[in-house]
């Protein structure tokens, strides 16, 4: 199933406690110097503007929306998982749906959190390296209040495209299903100096969003079971990545753009 419109969020809404309200508010910057506060506000504003500007020119096409709908039935709420390199594409594709995302407690995490909050996301602060348990507890609370969650599943610092256990543990504690998702633009830049080689779509390109069947995690799963679910999630995302790259190749081979533009080469002289 495919289409160009954004998928509708069907998760229930209950209420907001203090943790949930905090996730949707900008964090206090009083612990930072004036220079760092200015940097956070400036960079977050620029990042928001760039994503909004680029995103408004991208035509998104969704495949597998029935899997997202299945994960949202009978009181269930999806736990979105995708690779960190797709964060710009994901932010715009699923904007305005009150999804709560775990963001790093680092300086960089401050402006990323503010940028995504402007698109209607909540942000809990923590990662696999800093404050992860506390952030996971906050995500459990927000999901119990009816809010979906999302993980850049190889973040915040990699290794690139290697699944980490946060989403598995959240699914175990909440009973909600994990939904693997992959994104690919038809034309893009890659930030090769960043650890994840962040994907920046080129203006007026298309973007394919492929959604895999949900993965459920039993509440009594043991350590070996967690490892098995990690492999299942890894395999699902790897398969989605291959499908995305196949779509990109097929799309560009039939594109009306001249070959030298598709290759990123100079115009023939």
Regions found by a protein language model. Name each.
Residues 76-130, 134, 174, 190:
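Catalytic core of membrane glycerolipid acyltransferases/transacylases, capturing the structured
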Residues 68-69, 91, 113, 167-168:
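Short amphipathic alpha-helical segments and helix-helix/interface helices
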């Amino acid at each position: 199933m495919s289409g160009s419109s954004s998928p509708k969020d069907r998760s229930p809404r209950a209420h907001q406690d203090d943790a949930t309200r905090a996730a949707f508010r900008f964090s206090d910057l009083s612990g930072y110097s004036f220079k760092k506060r200015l940097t956070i506000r400036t960079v977050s504003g620029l990042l928001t503007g760039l994503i909004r500007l680029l995103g408004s020119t991208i035509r998104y096409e969704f495949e597998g929306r029935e899997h997202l709908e299945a994960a949202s039935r009978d009181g269930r709420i999806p736990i979105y998982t995708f690779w960190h390199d797709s964060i710009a594409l994901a932010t715009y594709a699923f904007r305005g749906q009150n999804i709560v995302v775990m963001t790093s407690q680092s300086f960089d995490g401050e402006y990323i959190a503010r940028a995504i909050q402007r698109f209607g996301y909540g942000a809990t602060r923590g990662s696999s390296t800093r404050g992860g348990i506390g952030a996971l507890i906050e995500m459990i609370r927000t999901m119990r209040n009816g809010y979906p969650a999302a993980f850049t599943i190889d973040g915040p610092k990699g290794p690139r495209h290697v699944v980490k256990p946060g989403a598995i543990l959240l699914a175990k504690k909440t009973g909600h299903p994990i939904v693997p998702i992959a994104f690919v633009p038809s034309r893009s830049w890659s930030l090769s100096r960043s650890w994840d080689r962040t994907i920046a779509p080129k203006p007026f390109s298309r973007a394919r969003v492929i959604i895999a069947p949900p993965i459920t995690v039993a509440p009594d799963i043991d350590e070996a079971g967690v490892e098995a679910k990690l492999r299942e999630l890894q395999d699902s995302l790897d398969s989605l990545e291959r499908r995305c790259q196949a779509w990109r190749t097929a799309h560009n081979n039939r594109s009306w753009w001249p070959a030298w533009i598709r290759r990123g080469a100079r115009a023939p002289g």
